[in-house]
Amino acid sequence: MQIVVVGVDYKTAPVEIREKLAFAEAELGAAMKQLAKQKSVLENVIVSTCNRTEVYAVVDQLHTGRYYMKAFLAEWFGVKVEAIAPYLRVLEGEAAIKHLFRVAAGLDSMVLGETQILGQVKDSYLLAQEVGTSGTIFNHLFKQAVTFAKRAHSETGIGAHAVSVSYAAVELAKKIFGRLAGKHVLIIGAGKMGTLAAQNLYGSGVGKVTVVNRTLEKAKQLAKQFAGEAKPLGELSCALLEADIVISSTGAKGYILTKEMVAPLEKMRKGRPLFMVDIAVPRDLDPALADLETVFLYDIDDLQDVVAANLAERQKAAARIETMIEAELMAFSQWLQTLGVVPVIAALREKALAIQAETMKSLERKLPHLSERDWKVLNKHTKSIINQLLRDPILQAKELAAGPNAEEALLLFMKIFNIEDAVKAERHIEQAKSVQCDEQDAEAVRAARPSWQL
């Protein structure tokens, strides 16, 4: 069995290709069920976001599995395989497993270290459980990947620092005021960057938002998003008296606020600090405003410097996570290798215990005079002999499973002990148990899903 991932992302395909291969959320479960019917595909999970569509699968034959995974994508979206093939990323084995860990941890995201993808990976896995396309291998792998990604974020703090200009403004505001609860935000203009900064500030718990714009109607539309107040540009000075934080992005030709305009307001503000962020190009706020004692002025270049420094910190954290992933790969590989040897060991034990049981029956016929206590002692000691005899072969089987050419080595091991048929029977039993457990897990997921959040 092999693990394969086939898909597109923002690195391999332009948006016009990605949008053609994006699954609607409502159809994702049906798509996984359809993929499960494809030849060679044993398990599957599909992750589909605005930046990526990736099909993860456990296949019994590598070449056949790859072929049918590509064919499935082409058929589902009504395109030819040849049309999408140049944009597809195809990874196999350890490379595919490593990719999942990197994706879940946010290392493969457009915004390095973002956490939204972790929730999306988790939701896709939960859905696969619900529809029955995730089995023993993916249940283990995806749980491990999600758990690891949470730990990686917690231990490295990769997402702790802003890497967008709009959120960098929030970070600076927190450094000046500490807590933002109850602070009054004044938005000058209705530009995109200013709006994003306002959204981030509002999400951080500021108390009130006022929007000032040349066009009052636009100011009202933006203010409505934050349950705020709209004012015409002529009332800017009055709005400044109440504000703690000013975000300006008007796109005006000259300065809309100068040192001479703000200086008279300082006494009226009674020394309250005024945090001003100029996101406009050309600038809205006179650089001389920084000379005022209570004004903290930052422009777009200052914010870019903050973002660059924060990105460098994220890259350091990402390097740590890459190292952590290597340990996770080793742990999963060891688990996967032992997965194949479990039925072999079980069959070997069953054969040995069957021989011991037959021997005990023979002894009962030949030694009818033995007491019940004698039989208990005899049974205990014969089982002890069995366990001692099996100890070295079991250790050897585990080593074979972890070594090169494990499949061929285990086949030879089974032939030596004549347990091929018994191993097949054990695997059927394990498969039946796995299906039953998966059904129980899926039922538990359906019952608990609303409360299982990141």
Swiss-Prot record:
Positions bearing the site annotation: Important for activity: H99
Biological process annotations from GO: protoporphyrinogen IX biosynthetic process from glutamate
Pathway: Porphyrin-containing compound metabolism; protoporphyrin-IX biosynthesis; 5-aminolevulinate from L-glutamyl-tRNA(Glu): step 1/2
Active-site residue numbers: C50
Any one GO molecular function term: glutamyl-tRNA reductase activity
InterPro entries hit by this protein: 4pyrrol_synth_GluRdtase (IPR000343), 4pyrrol_synth_GluRdtase_dimer (IPR015896), 4pyrrol_synth_GluRdtase_N (IPR015895), GluRdtase_CS (IPR018214), GluRdtase_dimer_dom_sf (IPR036453), GluRdtase_N_sf (IPR036343), NAD(P)-bd_dom_sf (IPR036291), Shikm_DH/Glu-tRNA_Rdtase (IPR006151)
Keyword terms: NADP, Oxidoreductase, Porphyrin biosynthesis
SUPFAM superfamilies on file: Glutamyl tRNA-reductase catalytic, N-terminal domain, Glutamyl tRNA-reductase dimerization domain, NAD(P)-binding Rossmann-fold domains
Entry's EC annotation: 1.2.1.70
Domain of life: Bacteria
Enzymatic class: oxidoreductase
Residues that bind substrate: T49, C50, N51, R52, S109, E114, T115, Q116, Q120
Keyword Membrane: no
NCBIfam families listed in its UniProt record: hemA, PRK00045.1-3
Subunit structure: Homodimer.
Family, as annotated: Belongs to the glutamyl-tRNA reductase family.
Role summary: Catalyzes the NADPH-dependent reduction of glutamyl-tRNA(Glu) to glutamate 1-semialdehyde (GSA).
Note in the entry: During catalysis, the active site Cys acts as a nucleophile attacking the alpha-carbonyl group of tRNA-bound glutamate with the formation of a thioester intermediate between enzyme and glutamate, and the concomitant release of tRNA(Glu). The thioester intermediate is finally reduced by direct hydride transfer from NADPH, to form the product GSA.
Protein name, per record: Glutamyl-tRNA reductase
Species assigned in the record: Geobacillus kaustophilus (strain HTA426)
